[in-house]
Swiss-Prot record:
Keywords, comma-separated and alphabetical: ATP-binding, Cytoplasm, Hydrolase, Kinase, Nitrogen fixation, Nucleotide-binding, Phosphoprotein, Transferase, Two-component regulatory system
Record-given protein name: Sensory histidine kinase/phosphatase NtrB
A GO term for molecular function: phosphorelay sensor kinase activity
Entry comment on modification after translation: Autophosphorylated.
Amino acid sequence: MTSAMEFRRPVPTDGEAILNALPNPVLLVAPDGRIVDANIAAESFFEISTQFLRRQSLKELVPFGSPLLALIEQVRTSGSPVNEYKVDLGTPRIGGDRQVDLHVAPLTERPGHIVVMLQERTIADKMDRQLTHRSAARSVIALAAMLAHEIKNPLSGIRGAAQLLEQQASSEDRLLTRLICDEADRIVTLVDRMEVFGDDRPVARGPVNIHSVLDHVKRLAQSGFARNVRFIEDYDPSLPPVLANQDQLIQVFLNLVKNAAEAVADLGTDAEIQLTTAFRPGVRLSVPGKKSRVSLPLEFCVKDNGSGVPEDLLPNLFDPFVTTKQTGSGLGLALVAKIVGDHGGIIECESQPRKTTFRVLDADVQRRQATRPKQPR
């Protein structure tokens, strides 16, 4: 297992330190199109090291005809900065389209050099959509909790009546009374699961080592449903403990890993699940009920190389009864989203064929003065 923290970097200058403190990718492009400087956020965005970025031409990182190339030429010609919003920016390395806001400006001290800052919109947009869904779901959850009690009472009567009939029924009719009892039990089980969504009691929390949780989930998976799947771990050992309920975190990641295992079940020896943790400073958003913006510095990911989630399901993937499985109830991911939300965090999914990522961003972190203590893996 390796992490970015284990690689030694040269001591940055003041200017480099300021650039690396920015949460958004920043590039400095020379007149010939080469990237001569990049910050650490650019390393994460393009999924290659800054040392490699500094040897590349920008044309090798973005598709032919990319609007970014045209904007750079426009700024170089006019000498004036340009902002462009909601630009689809794909890269040959990571594939697909990533929607970003582009801020392009000339560097007056170095003629012909252009500064490019990219601000990715997908995470922010998904967070806003998830918070909107969470707020709208509260009324539905309240209705479900009220109906749960009203549904159980008549079901109990129906089941009791079926049992009485069963005592005097013929063998053929007993099959029908047993069917009535089984279906009543199935509805009660479904109602019980729905009642979980109406549970708004405070979550009992304490310091939790996230790597211990992930290791526990991995062992459970490898001894059962993911016995033939190859696991890859990429952990940041410097992460602080999470202020959370350990049992609920295990439930979250066990559900995500089980979904990933089902997604790669037909890949045989190529089946792969990756577990990653990272510290992402600068991710902040406003949450209903809180006056200040909340910091979400911890990132925990479950990735798989399965066929991916259908694009039309992605926006509503964490809503109840949304599922890609013929026999699924569609409540697993909805419960995961509820638990993460109860902890003050956000969960999102990015998916394309051979690369699906479930990302949990956590808001409740135990901070220890100015440093982040190391914890064992």
